[in-house]
Amino acid sequence: MAHGQHGGKSGPLGAGRRRGRGRWYAVAPALAATVVAACVPAAYAAAPPAPAAAAAPAQGAGDGLDRYHRQRLAWGSCVKGPDDTAGRDLDRAGVSCADVTVPLDYADPRGRTITVAVSRLKATDTRRRIGAVLLNNGGPGGTAVESPPHIRKAMKQVGTRYDIVGFDPRFVGRSTPLDCGWPVGTAWFSAGSGRAGFDRQVALQKDLADKCRAAGASVLAHISTRNTARDMDVIRGALGERKISYLGYSYGTYLGTVYTQMFPGRYDRVVLDGAVAPGDYKARLMQGAEPENERALSDWAAWAAGRHDAHGLGRTRAEVLATVEGIVAASARGPLTVGAAPEVFRLDDTQVPLILFMGIADDTDKARTALAEQVSALAKAAQGRPAPLSPDFAQLLRYALTGEQAATGGVQAAIICGDVGAPRDPEVYWRDIERSRAAHPLFGPLTNNINPCAFWDRPREELTRVRRDAAVLIVAATGDPRTTYRSSAGLHELLPSSKLITVENANRHGLYGEYGNGCVDGEVNAYLATGKLPKEDRTCSTASPSSSSSSSSSSD
């Protein structure tokens, strides 16, 4: 995720992507989302438009939820206060906002309630209105209230036929808040180069869990993906929609899959971008993704080598990687000092790998340049030289290493730890870290490290498993270092009626409306327009983003 003016810092491992994008471990400079025009593939057939829904259906009646499904939403200004520039931007874009009341505990619908913030950019082509599409930007813990204007642009002509609805999941963003009071913005650090770093991490992660327990004792048990899916269904009912369409990125693909399993028959068109197979969803989210991250780093190193005159990191891939290794080794000997008074940061070997990890989820030139600038600053610090920070790098470090945006990290941990249990014994993590070092010395100690879930109460519900087919559209890049292509393909196999759009040779997390690939955008928009999945799985090239896709045999 990258920093941005609209979404704030909502990402899990870095500043939040523009428009509230909060994608799972995706940190990169904000993109000026240029959507390339593409022709609608001929493999689609038109479907009849759906009229605007009238009253909410009676789904939920008999289980105490009827009053939530039938609530009247008070749509109005999105501005929450005098400093709410994002709210003013939404108002200017024609977006309206409201709060949806949901039960804290769905087992006790007459008990305590909380609110979930929603935003809506209404369809302007009312004669051909299709319905409403609900957005989730991942994270977990990412916001989406600020996303409808951007998604409307990505959807092109079909966007005018939808009510585009963003929401901030329970305890996220503009919804009923939870702030654990963390001293850092994320829990996802490396174990470092030795036992001392790991022991510091054990103490930190226990402290983070304890802080959340102290701040949110009455709500933590009710923060989970399954409860967010239940909130989504209340939103659907409150909007008056019999079925709702859905666009989810990263973790949002897991949330979307959970919704299809919990509420079959209540969804229409579902797009899952950068998908997570339910079996891959675990407390250590990135465990097993070390090869993809190392390939992404290696590809970035080759790119940086071609720009040695600009960044001075090495003239070959091997030289750039040696520079990176030297930085990590120096940080293990003692923290690296970057920045200048009054803003100075000291980064050790539990933090430097995080910076590298955050920078490789986007292979655009802009993102790669930003990472090169960050590595250049770290290289200077490793040599004991002054290492001034760019505004973007300073913002990223403030997010990760201070409490400036601590609420984001705390809620993300609450969602993950509320979903899935984790080993309690720190030695389990240490053994995994040590086993990973030989093959993956840089990222193994990060992806296998302990986190707050080791000290969390056990989840109230079991993880959701796929037991029903769902005709969804999955979008994935072969080199995605966050939600790996293996996971997207795995979800595709679990859902025989799904179709998979593959972007080859891209180290990119998050494609639709973000990557400028006209093939991807065209396929997704055709599906949203017609409700018809492509007849076959499709492959899109990165060589000419605005060109048509090439077809491949279905892997169903």
Model-derived regions, located:
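Catalytic-loop region of hydrolases
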Residues: 2-7, 14-30, 37, 41-195, ...
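Alpha/beta-hydrolase fold active-site neighborhood
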Residues: 63-65, 322-470, 513-515
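A catalytic-pocket lid/entrance helix-loop region that shapes and gates access to the active site
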Residues: 179-192, 258-323, 356-358, 373-389
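Conserved acidic catalytic loop of the alpha/beta-hydrolase fold
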Residues: 211-218, 229-243
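Alpha/beta-hydrolase fold nucleophile elbow
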Residues: 241-251
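Conserved strand-to-loop "acid loop" that flanks and positions the catalytic carboxylate
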Residues: 473-479
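Conserved alpha/beta-hydrolase "acid-adjacent" motif
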Residues: 481-486
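Catalytic histidine-centered segment of alpha/beta-hydrolase-like enzymes
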Residues: 507-518
